[in-house]
């Protein structure tokens, strides 16, 4: 991904039970994505029509944060068709957790086996982790898709999503 990226994960983990740095191995019970379930099951059981994989990337020395090594000002919008069902997969190639948030639509998190697990607005992706979720593009317009660590968002870890 070029100069905007200072590391890349070859074998990302797919586990959802990692509480994150500083909380592992302390003997505490920590709520993780693996513990969460949405009552009633998957609100939209359709299979995804397409897959989008985005790498969470950055260069800590240069304080650049990006998706696929591309900062917001150099990126193109992601286009979703109205009512399309998609699978978005994040691969975190950085040393930090990133709480990723898509405005206007829900993120239906999948377990490592691909089964629906929980509906969320913000999905935390731990370092060296791969997390997939399904999205139903049911909100027309232009939407923000960004890291909720606002300084990461401001430094480029942001994409525009267009549903049209």
Task: Give the location of each predicted region.
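Copper-binding active sites and cupredoxin-like electron-transfer domains
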Residues: 1-164
């Amino acid at each position: 991904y070029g100069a905007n990226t200072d590391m890349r994960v070859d074998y990302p983990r797919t586990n959802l039970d990692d509480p994150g740095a500083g909380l592992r191995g302390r003997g505490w019970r920590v709520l993780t994505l693996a513990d969460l379930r949405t009552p009633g099951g998957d609100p939209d059981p359709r299979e995804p029509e397409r897959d989008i994989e985005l790498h969470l990337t950055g260069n800590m020395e240069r304080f650049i944060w990006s998706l696929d090594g591309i900062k917001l000002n150099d990126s193109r919008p992601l286009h979703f068709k109205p009512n399309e069902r998609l699978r978005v997969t994040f691969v975190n190639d950085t040393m930090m957790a990133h709480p990723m948030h898509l405005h206007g639509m829900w993120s239906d998190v999948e377990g490592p086996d691909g089964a629906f697990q929980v509906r969320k607005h913000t999905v935390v992706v731990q370092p060296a982790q791969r997390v997939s979720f399904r999205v139903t593009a049911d909100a027309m317009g232009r939407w923000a898709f960004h890291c909720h660590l606002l300084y990461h968002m401001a430094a480029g870890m942001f994409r525009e999503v267009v549903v049209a």
